[in-house]
C-alpha cells in the first residue's frame, strides 16, 4: 500500500467517525432540551442505530457485494446522508425529526462496513496495516467532541446551539461523499453470485448456539446491551443536569480509554482467559453505573470521570473479547458469518430492546422538565448488569480455551466494531 493510499484511507476513516461523533453523543440532550421530547422518544431515536444495524447487511449483501463498487456506494450514501442531516437540523418537533434520522441511520450504518471493505482491499497485510488506519476513526470521534465543547455548543443553558452539531455532521458527510469518489476502486466481490438472506445475516453461524457455553455468552451479550443503551441515550443529558462543564469533550475520555485498553487486551487475555475477561467487562458496566448514581459535579466529581474512563474496560473486555472468542470458536469457514451474527444480535436486537427500556425508565423517574432522579435511573442498569454477571459466572463453562495467541487475532476484530 502506497503512502498516498494510506493517507486517503486514514482521511476516510477520520471523517466516517467524525460524522457520527458530531451528533450522536449529544443526541439525548438535544432532544430533551431543544425538541422537548420524552425519554421514550429519546430511546426511539437511539433505536434508529439498531434498525440501521439490522438493515445494513441487506444493503451490503444485495447491492455493495454484487452490483456496485464499494467506494461509489459509500460516496452516494454520504451525499444523501449529508442532505438528511441538514434536514434533521430544521425539524421543529420529534414527529418531524424521527423519520429523517431513521432514514439517515439506515443509510449510515452500512457505511461502517463499506469503509472497512475499501480499506482491506488495498492491503497486503491487514493485521498490521489496518489498526493504524482504524484508530483515525476513534480520533475523529474524539475531535468532534472537542470541537463541540470548544465552540460551547454543549454549555449549560446554551443547548439550543446543539442544532449546529447536525449541520457540522452534514457538511462533513458531504465532504466524505465527494471524497469517496477519489478512493481506490473497490469492485463488487460477489458479482453474479446468489446471496441468501441467511448469508447476509450471518445465520450460517447459528450452529454455534448448540455449544452451551456459547449460547450463554450469546444471551449475555444481548442482555448486557440493555445497560449499554442507557449510556448511549442518556449519559450526556445526565452530565448536563449534574452540572458538568464541557460534557462532550469530557465524554471523549471514554474513547481514549478504549484505545489504551485495546492495546492491553493480549496481556490480560493470556492471564485471565475468556470467562474472566468477559466477567470483568460486565462488572465494569455495573460499577460505572454505580459511580454515575453517586457521583456529582462537586466533591464526587471523580466518580463521574471514573465512570467515563471505565468505558475502555466495559467495551474492550466484553465486546472485543467476545469477538475474539466467537472468531476462534467459529472456525475458518464461518468466521465472517459468526461476526455478522453476533453484531446483529447485540447492536441490532440487544440495543433496540435496551433503548426502549431506557427511555421508559428515564420517563418514570422524571422530576421536572429539567431534572430526573438519576440515582435511581443509573442503579437500574447497574442491577441489570450485576444480574447478568452472576448468571454468566454460574452458567458459563470455559471449556473452549483459546488455542491461538489472542494477540494475533486482536487486529482482525477491529473491522467488526460499530462502537468507538
Feature roles, as predicted:
Residues 55-92:
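Conserved MFS/SLC helix-loop-helix module at the cytosolic interface between two early adjacent transmembrane helices
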Residues 150-171, 360-385:
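A membrane-interface helix-boundary motif in multi-pass transporters
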Residues 88-90, 173-184, 379-411, 418-420:
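Multi-pass alpha-helical transporter architecture, strongest
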Residues 72-86, 276-291:
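Structural signature of the two symmetry-related core transmembrane helices
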Residues 2-50, 213-251, 319:
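Helix-loop boundary and gating motifs at the non-cytosolic
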Residues 14, 84, 94-114, 118, ...:
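Hydrophobic core of transmembrane alpha-helices in multi-pass small-molecule transporters
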Residues 1-3, 183-219, 412-416:
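Juxtamembrane intracellular "pre-TM" segments in multi-pass secondary transporters
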Residues 55-69, 152-153, 260-274, 362-363:
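Helix-to-loop junctions at the C-terminal end of transmembrane segments
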